[in-house]
């Protein structure tokens, strides 16, 4: 499914920039500053997590996420880590928002997790994902 969406995005990029069909698409996506579909999905999931943690998402999404609580003194609560529920199924269970979203959130650096303005979060997240996608 993602490869089909990526093909559509590539075609749209070629139409917008009037690029030939057999030219490499990566420079075109970089020029347009478009994230590949896989990274765009990560962006949207992490943005939804940010909104949920800051009270800007629907209640049913906010209820899927909870901060990690640790009884040991070594775990610091100021890390803003989310609890990752265990899933029984590796293929579909790990793809559920309630499992995948906390994993992605916990992979972010503390700098990202502590941003208080949504505009800053979106800007820094897109820049970070863009660098990862294109090794820039």
Predicted regions and their residues:
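Hydrophobic/basic alpha-helical segments
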Residues: 1-136
